[in-house]
A protein has these predicted regions:
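Fe(II)/2-oxoglutarate oxygenase catalytic core
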Residues: 1-152, 160-193
């Protein structure tokens, strides 16, 4: 493998879910307002999130299986298998909706900021639909990934990969979002985020 550049650690995979599967997840999200929660920090982010609950375990299993296939492809493509932790754990799967209201989006940030999030080593964003705007943008690397049904982006969550969720302009953007994290050390009581 030739010398790897930072942008090479941002991988995009197409067709991880069919358009029909994506539409079904969006419909189920919209049919579950009791499980939705507005997440908002002035000047930083705003979106509606649905954290997977016992009513969504089938979705968590489906997404978990799909992601495990692509996480394997990720570390194989980069030749980092020997550095990949055995038996990584997955943070809860979240479905998110960003409205085209001029407020929803996520300013540049990283996904590891403190002891609680320090177990994260991979970010996964699975887009469920197409919209104008709504790109995941890596400003330091000038890399932009547009939303499309079944498109998956995988990258490290660290300070070398600040990224933004740009606001959608014409319709809501829906994503599935999760992280892989290191398993706790043997004998540790910590479970992670």
């Amino acid at each position: 493998m030739s010398k790897t550049q930072l942008a090479d650690y941002i991988k995009v995979y197409e067709g991880t879910l069919s358009s029909e599967q994506c539409d079904a997840l969006i419909a189920r999200f919209e049919a579950s307002p009791a499980h939705q929660e507005l997440k908002h920090a002035e000047g930083s982010y705003r979106f509606v999130q649905l954290s997977v609950t016992k009513h969504w375990l089938d979705v968590e299993a489906q997404i978990g299986h799909i992601l495990s296939v692509y996480f394997h492809k990720y570390h194989e493509a980069l030749g980092i298998g020997r550095f990949w932790p055995p038996n990584p754990l997955s943070e809860e799967v979240r479905l998110k909706r960003y409205l085209p209201n001029g407020s929803d989006g996520f300013t540049p940030h990283v996904d590891v900021m403190d002891h609680t999030t320090a177990s994260r080593f991979i970010t996964a964003i699975l887009y469920l639909n197409t919209c104008s705007g709504g790109e995941t943008f890596f400003p330091d690397l000038n890399v932009s990934i547009a939303p499309a049904p079944g498109r998956l982006v995988v990258f490290p969550p660290l300070w070398t990969f600040p990224h933004a969720g740009l606001p959608p302009r014409d319709r809501a953007k829906y994503i599935v979002h999760t992280y892989l994290w290191y398993p706790p050390a043997a004998g540790s009581r910590e479970r992670g985020p």
